[in-house]
């Protein structure tokens, strides 16, 4: 299973929000390039970026940092947040990003997702951010009536590379992942599902392993890495693709 460190960008700095609340911001670093290089040096195989300003306003606000990170790293970089047009998505791919993540437009302009997936195979990911099972959009500031699982089914055969599913209720809380919601998403999707939200310790990461065979291929980790609750290199060794053995749910190693 792939462990993907997250860098959330707000006003050019690395931050984390609590349950997506822009009024509950924790600032971790003023140098996102140095932070990105640190995750790479610790063994990350991919980096996840979020333009929080872009997600909120619908227009890019951290492009200087995004481009600097893409140019500095040797590993693939993906970005979500405010990617709401073909032109914006292709600009990001042309500047060195491996993948773009489409969230709001997946609800509002589903045909755009299809077009981009056909033009750029393997480079388009759909981000499904859910609150009580229903999709939230525009930086989580608006709530739709669309079920997250229905949206996953809608794009399963569209040629996208993966679905990133974020449980808003647990995001930034360190309270553990919503395993039931993850299982439902994996069952609804025929493409790999990447989990996001709630990871607070190694036991949380290990709890995802039984879902790997059901289609959960990776996990995005943010606050737990910044707080030092999880060591990235250790986590990669425990649940990464090169791990020595699987650890079952009932194992005492989860303690």
Curated annotation (Swiss-Prot):
Subcellular location: Cytoplasm
Residue spans crossing the bilayer: none
Ribosomal protein listed as a keyword: no
One Pfam family linked to the record: His_biosynth
Primary residence: cytoplasm
InterPro entries reported in the protein's UniProt record: Aldolase_TIM, His_biosynth, HisA_bact_arch, Isoase_HisA-like, Isoase_HisA-like_bact, RibuloseP-bd_barrel
Active site per UniProt: 8 (proton acceptor), 129 (proton donor)
GO molecular function: 1-(5-phosphoribosyl)-5-[(5-phosphoribosylamino)methylideneamino]imidazole-4-carboxamide isomerase activity
Assigned EC number: 5.3.1.16
The reaction(s) this protein catalyses: 1-(5-phospho-beta-D-ribosyl)-5-[(5-phospho-beta-D-ribosylamino)methylideneamino]imidazole-4-carboxamide = 5-[(5-phospho-1-deoxy-D-ribulos-1-ylimino)methylamino]-1-(5-phospho-beta-D-ribosyl)imidazole-4-carboxamide
Biological process according to GO: L-histidine biosynthetic process; L-tryptophan biosynthetic process
Cellular compartments per GO CC: cytoplasm
Keyword annotations: Amino-acid biosynthesis, Cytoplasm, Histidine biosynthesis, Isomerase
Pathway info: Amino-acid biosynthesis; L-histidine biosynthesis; L-histidine from 5-phospho-alpha-D-ribose 1-diphosphate: step 4/9
Superkingdom: Bacteria
CDD domains according to UniProt: HisA
Keyword Thylakoid: no
Protein family per UniProt: Belongs to the HisA/HisF family.
HAMAP family in the cross-refs: HisA
Protein name: 1-(5-phosphoribosyl)-5-[(5-phosphoribosylamino)methylideneamino] imidazole-4-carboxamide isomerase
Organism, as annotated: Synechococcus sp. (strain CC9902)
The gene coding this protein: hisA
